[in-house]
Amino acid sequence: MFWIVLAIIVSTLIGLYSERRWPDQAGQASRRSLVLLLYVILPPIIFVNLVHVEFHGGVGIGLALGLLAIGLVGLAAWVIAVPFLKLPRQVAGAVIVSSLLANSSFLGYPMVLSLMGGDDLSEGVVYDVLVNGMSLMLFAFAVGAAFGTEVGEGASQRVKAFFFRNPLLTAAVLGLLAPDALAPGWLVDASRVLVALIMPLGFFAVGAVLAEEERAGTIRLPPKLHRPVVVVIFTRLVLSPGLLILLTMPFSGIPPSYYLLAAMPTGINSMIVGHAYGLDLRTTAEAIVYTTTIVVAAVLGYVLIT
């Protein structure tokens, strides 16, 4: 776990420094790293780990309740941001999106593999693809379209992109349909080596994007803690795992990786949605910084204690 924390810190700092030192090249490199993750590294990890998943009762129930919990988190974020705090429209949308989207791939996969093991990673991949994937493609894009200041693509285009231009969904479907012979043990082991590449690439991109937003005047580093970010900290890190625990209490056999992934910090995808629809990027960027810092500090404390 110490190496996970170190990788997060070092990768983010390299991204920050690179963007400040070579702004054009670093920005391009950060986007290429996200493309590499999306189209090259994550699909085979998802495929080979889903081939061997067995959907016993606890898995299916956990997935259904995970979707319900995410929906309730989004609703709670809306209640706090809109009727209660009366935040500006684009800020409220950023709060809701940042509450919905977890960093379950870049940070979640390595943490599940390190803390729990390979079998739990396979079940965690299912949760990530189905629960967090639906949260991104359906919930977050819908919120962006409803609250953003810029006109996004229409609903029909988003649906087509979800089904036909989503390599993670394609890999998931193929993995669920494929026979076990297509994912022998050595290939599963190799996929877990690829997991080690996710975090440095992902957090390099986070650091570069944050520095880019600072250069553009969107945020200041270190960011100031303000009310919208406090809401995200509560909904993402407290309410999300808390609701899943509460909803699953009557049931047994829920994979433990579900709870860990439900407690992951705000994902970089919140900034992607914010860019696309004109949400407040300061809020999304600061939510990433603060929620990730809290989770990393908690992990570091766990490492020191154990």
State each model region's role.
Residues 1-306:
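Alpha-helical transmembrane segments of multi-pass small-molecule/ion transporters
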